[in-house]
Amino acid sequence: MAISYSGPPPVTGAWQEGDHPGQRKFVELGAIELELGGSLPEVKVAYETFGKLNSNSSNAIYIEHALTGDSHAAGLDTDGHLTRGWWDGLIGPGLAINTNEWFVVCANVLGGCQGTTGPSSLAPNGDRWGSTFPRVTVSDQVEIEKRLTDYLKIEKWASIMGGSMGGMRVLEWAVEYPNRINSAFVIASAPRSSADQIATQSAQISAIKSDPKWRDGDYYEAKAGDGPHVGLGIARRFAQLTYRSETELDVRFGRDNQDGEDPYSRNFWKSATRSR
């Protein structure tokens, strides 16, 4: 779904303090020492719930979002949420993940910038973390999700589900905390990035960093319309080519006759020649 703005687009799509919370709930889960070094002195997590937890907490399902997702897995595009839930057709009463039966939890991942601590959050010095935000791993992210699980007093998830980068976190759960899940549902994911994925993503990173408005990652205080939108747009175009099938790409971008013209007619070629 495309998002339209009446004026220049905001410098960032991140949720920030003071924005409408929407359906988000928040919990502070303490400090974390990170796998690659460094630490975060306090981690706040934004999460949403759907359905009702039963008396013995046996009907809980955890949903893992992909790289650019958030906690809004289901629900309307209301205050605090620019779009409908990204799995809105799957989660709800009578749907595949039936909230008449299941209690569903989805949290914004560590570093995700949609309410959970990330580069757009305020650092202890009062500035946005921006370029100073430390590197985090899937292991760090799942550690925070495990703390959220403990906070919610859920002993074992009936299932954990996720696709893409979310699927990587599902796999991490299965490896690190197998006694805390009954089943794992991994969609379009892998235990590690392949060489071609690393190569493509390095090109995406270069596209973003080459945008002068990237400002080395410290662009949060810029005015509307002055963010790294061009670089991000190019990176997104790269991304669109990496998770589409050949058939779909042909439908979207394949050669096609223009304006109902017959490319084999004599008049078509005369017209095309004159226009050169």
Model-predicted segments: where are they?
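A gly/proline- and charged-residue-enriched helix-loop-helix capping module
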Residues: L82-E101, T137-S139, K146, Y151, ...
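Alpha/beta-hydrolase
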Residues: G18, I198-R276
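Conserved acidic catalytic loop of the alpha/beta-hydrolase fold
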Residues: G126-T132, S139-S159, P178
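Conserved hydrolase catalytic core segment
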Residues: E155-T200
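A short beta-to-alpha transition loop/helix N-cap that caps and shapes the active-site region
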Residues: S71, Q114-G115, A190-S202, S206-K209
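Alpha/beta-hydrolase-fold catalytic nucleophile elbow
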Residues: A107, F185-A188, L241
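Catalytic-loop region of hydrolases
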Residues: A2-I63, D77
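N-terminal cap/lid subdomain of alpha/beta-hydrolase-fold enzymes
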Residues: E48, K52-A123
